[in-house]
């Protein structure tokens, strides 16, 4: 059905209709006459349908009320009176996306599904949640999702608990997050951007139930809403449903959600402390941020221009401003960022791995370098390459498994929220044309002059490390709570105990069957029985296996090279991981690293380098370690892409000592900033490395790599020749024809070109010897407590069930869903207050449980240990079991882009997973019943009794539970 301008349909007026060539879609702007709701519909033939409803939410304090509201609306509503309908949807729908998101000035609720009935169910639950949530009258929702005083008994220690409270404690454990908050405080003292929409842990306990309910009443009205629809759907039925079930129950009202524009408060220069561990060194751990407010960047052309400039000046390996800052010794890790999606966008420079005395030198150097560039002109080759890179990404529209409509729905809010054309943020042809012309007419230089050099609206903020600060803050909080408890009467203490116990009882009580049945669900008959088939042709070119995956790729060819890493020593494995961080950013015999970067940007869609491993399906001692080149480009430029792959793999040199040192030190500084944020990944691989050779190999790129790069960074200035020689040696050892397997994803027509062009790389590689043997990592149970200055934990426990004689089958995929959104969700998130927990079960028998931003430690380990008991008595209705099966399929059957299809095909290839094996797994999954889940209890019990534990988190918490660990260690210093 096509809509017509000026048409009225189901209470909606069609205000405007336009074709959007960039999306190959027809776009309709509508408004709901009675309620005032706005609606944008992007009509096309994409079966991955998307719906979202967003609200402009402008908090006036840092209690996190928008964030807590986002969590809480999905905790039961008028039509769906369950404790957490969101969880029921996750485990019982065919969604391809399901989440909610809090931004500085808006809250979004998007869903996606390829199944029409499922899509309608998702819309129904989400619309009821945002307009009629139980959180308004049920104070236990705020207690659970936001915060509450917690007392187990009158004699116990008074604490704060709450999911968002602990989530934000984890967020603010990262210096980067602290820096972002300080920058926004400095730049926006008088507007909503000057407060933390996610919530500051120090302020969250100030939120009252009355303020919470009032916030929802004010902002969650259709007159303040933005509805978005995308894809192939019956729009007549969809609009009728939205109107009849929801919007017709409201009338237009005035909602004061305006975002005030901050007038320039003058330039700001500020310094703040951040916590590091007691006794930790402070050298090179200061962060600086120079950030400018770019008021006119709501213009999509200006916004795109600043993204191009950010890459040219600060992100490209050839970036001149980054080089100037590094050469001046101001920092080890330099990066840049353009932040749109707010009324007054920001352009910023981050200088990490620095010291406090460097602050005064940053602004003068930046101004000098940029002034010189404006005077002499920016490098046109760099600009052209950066713009080509931007254009390639826009046209490819590969969002790494996320639905296209989801990304478009978020992007359109970049203008729509500020009362501008929503399609302006989705159209890019005009901006590309303007910027192409701008390379030669001084456009970019003019932007630098106007928005940076002549702009007084900036903040220079520094974060200086202070050992023991976190511990002192935690003690002050404990003292504050103890003093508050001491001020309470017996009746008041008893009331807190009663409230705490009542909440725990609610959390432990399952929803009634009647409540569960309010959530519509599909049946097993509705489910796709056949496994996704990925066609792959194999042939041999010059002795190398080449796998071809046919797909429609819009003129793009994807080339993936996998070099076998058998035969490496333990030291060589560390150097291979280092090589993946450096290669492509170093000189070659024919080009400087800057020239290489420019050629990649000019002629390709990017080349990435990584190290990974594919495990044997039935034996974790046997695996395929690989170094991967992941490259893509327009087929018309495939010859240039292959030339670059050939040059980088064969002719990279490590003789530029300064460049080598800069990259090593930048890598180390990056780990210093990111290690805690990726704590769940670190502990997951680390705990499995105690028992699994393949995971020991992966850990060589995680915590072990952080330890390695710390050592290398400490001696790179003196030992550059030795380190460079080892990198060269390992590069020559691994990049051989005998070690190579190639994969190409392209259309049939483009494959003809690839078959002619790609052999040039194969033929250039030395033959080499077939790699043999795997490294002996000397596995042992270390049970480490990794102590940090963070205030939350990442708690992992795992092992291998095949070592106990158990096999893998498809029911374990269903168990994953049951645990993540049942047992662990309740125990770790709902009752424990962690942000989340997840499980992993692998074909080779490796399995792990891990919590994320967890305020607890011992109780989470105890929850893992009690899991087998839970499974032994697991008993749910057939309807509930079917929901778990459906939810499992929704995670497996995600729509694949061409690049993801190629990657999935190669995963099956390297692990020996034939289509027949994949079909067997699916059949087992689809047939899983409660009895099959109970039968898994012995293998879980066996692995938990192996007692492999690894935790990263608060030093105090880890020391309190030191009996759980054989080793207490700190992150590298």
Language-model regions, residue ranges each:
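Non-catalytic, conformational "gating/processing" segments within enzyme and secreted inhibitor domains
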Residues: 161, 213-243, 724-758, 945
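M16 family metallopeptidases and their MPP-like homologs
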Residues: 48-58, 84-132, 139-150, 177-202, ...
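Hydrophobic, small-residue-rich alpha-helical packing segments that form membrane-like cores
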Residues: 153-224, 228-246, 250-277, 282-284, ...
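Extended, regular secondary-structure scaffolds
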Residues: 214, 226, 235-253, 376, ...
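Generic recognition of flexible, low-complexity loop/linker segments
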Residues: 97, 213-217, 275-278, 321, ...
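His/Glu-based metal-binding/catalytic segments typifying zinc-dependent metallopeptidases
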Residues: 43-45, 52-54, 165, 169, ...
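Non-catalytic terminal extensions that flank enzyme cores
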Residues: 1-50
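Active-site His/Glu-centered metal-binding helix of metallohydrolases
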Residues: 65, 69-73, 579
């Amino acid at each position: 059905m096509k809509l017509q301008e000026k048409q009225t349909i189901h209470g909606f007026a069609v205000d405007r209709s336009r074709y959007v060539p960039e999306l190959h879609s027809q776009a309709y702007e509508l408004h709901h006459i009675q309620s005032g709701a706005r609606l944008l519909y992007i009509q096309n033939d994409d079966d991955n349908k998307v719906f979202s409803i967003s609200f402009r939410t402008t908090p006036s304090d840092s209690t996190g009320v928008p964030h807590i509201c986002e969590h809480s609306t999905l905790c039961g509503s008028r039509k769906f009176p369950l404790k957490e309908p969101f969880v029921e949807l996750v485990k019982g729908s065919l969604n391809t996306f399901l989440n909610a998101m809090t931004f500085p000035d808006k809250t979004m609720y998007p869903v996606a599904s390829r199944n029409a009935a499922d899509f309608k169910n998702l819309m129904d639950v989400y619309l009821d949640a945002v307009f009629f949530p139980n959180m308004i009258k049920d104070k236990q929702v705020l207690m659970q999702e936001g915060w509450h005083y917690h007392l187990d008994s009158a004699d116990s220690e008074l604490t704060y608990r709450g999911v968002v409270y602990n989530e934000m404690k984890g967020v603010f454990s990262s210096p980067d997050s602290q820096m972002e908050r300080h920058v926004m405080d400095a730049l926006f003292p008088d507007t909503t951007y000057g407060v933390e929409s996610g919530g500051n842990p120090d302020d969250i306990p100030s939120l009252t139930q009355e303020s919470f309910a009032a916030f929802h009443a004010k902002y969650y009205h259709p007159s303040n809403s933005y509805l978005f629809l995308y894809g192939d759907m019956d729009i007549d039925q969809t609009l009728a449903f939205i109107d009849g079930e929801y919007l017709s129950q409201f009338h237009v009202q005035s909602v004061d959600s305006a975002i005030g524009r901050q007038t320039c408060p003058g330039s700001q220069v500020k310094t703040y402390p951040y916590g590091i561990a007691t006794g930790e060194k402070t050298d090179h751990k200061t962060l600086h941020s120079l950030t400018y407010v770019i008021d006119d960047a709501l213009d999509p052309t200006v916004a795109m221009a600043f993204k191009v400039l950010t890459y040219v000046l600060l992100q490209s390996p050839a970036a001149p401003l980054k080089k100037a800052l590094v050469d001046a010794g101001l920092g080890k890790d330099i990066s840049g960022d353009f932040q749109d999606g707010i009324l007054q966008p920001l352009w910023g420079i981050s200088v990490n791995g620095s010291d406090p005395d460097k602050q005064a030198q940053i602004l003068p150097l930046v101004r000098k370098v940029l002034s010189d560039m404006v005077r002499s002109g920016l490098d046109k080759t760099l600009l052209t390459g950066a713009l080509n890179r931007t254009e390639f990404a826009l046209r490819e529209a590969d969002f790494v498994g996320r639905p296209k409509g989801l990304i478009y729905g978020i992007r359109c809010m970049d203008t729509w929220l500020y009362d501008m054309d929503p399609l302006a943020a989705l159209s890019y042809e005009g901006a590309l044309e303007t910027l192409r012309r701008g390379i030669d007419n001084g456009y970019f230089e003019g932007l630098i002059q106007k928005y940076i050099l002549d702009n007084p609206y900036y903040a220079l903020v520094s974060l200086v490390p202070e050992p023991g600060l976190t511990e002192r803050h935690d003690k002050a909080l404990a003292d504050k709570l103890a003093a508050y408890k001491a001020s309470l009467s017996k009746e008041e203490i008893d009331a807190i105990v009663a409230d705490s116990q009542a909440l725990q009882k609610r959390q432990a009580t399952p929803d009634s069957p009647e409540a569960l049945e309010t959530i519509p669900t599909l049946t097993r008959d509705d489910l796709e029985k056949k496994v996704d088939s990925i066609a792959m042709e194999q042939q041999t070119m010059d002795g190398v296996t080449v796998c071809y995956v046919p797909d429609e790729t819009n003129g793009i060819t994807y080339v993936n090279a996998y070099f076998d890493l058998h035969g490496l020593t333990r030291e060589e494995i560390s150097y291979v991981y280092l090589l993946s961080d450096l290669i492509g950013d170093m000189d070659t015999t024919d080009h400087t690293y800057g020239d290489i970067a420019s050629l990649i940007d000019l002629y390709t869609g990017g080349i990435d380098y990584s190290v990974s491993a594919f495990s044997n399906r039935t034996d974790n001692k046997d695996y395929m370690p690989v170094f991967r080149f992941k490259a893509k480009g327009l087929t018309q430029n495939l010859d240039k892409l292959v030339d670059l792959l050939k040059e980088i793999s064969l002719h990279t040199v490590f003789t530029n000592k300064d460049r080598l040192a800069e990259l090593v030190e930048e890598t180390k500084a990056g780990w210093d900033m990111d290690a805690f944020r990726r704590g769940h990944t670190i502990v997951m691989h680390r705990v499995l490395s105690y028992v699994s050779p393949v995971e020991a190999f992966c850990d060589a790129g995680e915590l072990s790599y952080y330890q390695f790069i710390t050592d290398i960074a400490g001696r790179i200035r003196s030992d550059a020749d030795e380190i460079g020689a080892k990198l060269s040696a390992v590069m020559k050892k691994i990049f051989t024809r005998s070690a190579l397997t190639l994969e190409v994803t392209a259309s049939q027509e483009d494959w003809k070109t690839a078959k002619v062009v790609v052999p040039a790389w194969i033929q250039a590689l030395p033959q080499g010897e077939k790699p043999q043997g795997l490294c002996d990592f000397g596995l042992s149970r270390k049970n480490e407590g990794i102590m940090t200055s963070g205030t939350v934990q990442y708690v992992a426990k795992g092992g291998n069930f095949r070592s106990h004689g158990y096999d893998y089958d498809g029911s374990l995929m269903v168990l994953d869903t049951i645990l993540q959104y049942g047992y662990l969700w309740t125990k770790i998130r709902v009752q424990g207050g962690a942000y989340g927990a997840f499980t992993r079960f692998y074909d080779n028998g490796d399995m792990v449980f891990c919590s994320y931003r967890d305020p607890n430690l011992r109780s989470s380990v105890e929850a893992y240990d009690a899991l087998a008991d839970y499974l032994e008595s697991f008993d749910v209705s057939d309807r509930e079991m079917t929901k778990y099966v459906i939810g499992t399929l929704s995670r497996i059957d995600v729509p694949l882009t061409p690049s993801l299809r190629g990657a999935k095909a190669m995963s099956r290839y390297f692990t020996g997973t034939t289509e027949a094996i994949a079909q067997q797994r699916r059949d087992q999954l689809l047939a899983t019943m409660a009895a099959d889940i109970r039968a898994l209890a012995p293998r879980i019990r066996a692995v938990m009794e192996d007692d492999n534990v690894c935790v990263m988190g608060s030093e105090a918490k880890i020391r309190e539970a030191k009996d759980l660990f054989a080793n207490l260690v700190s992150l590298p210093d």
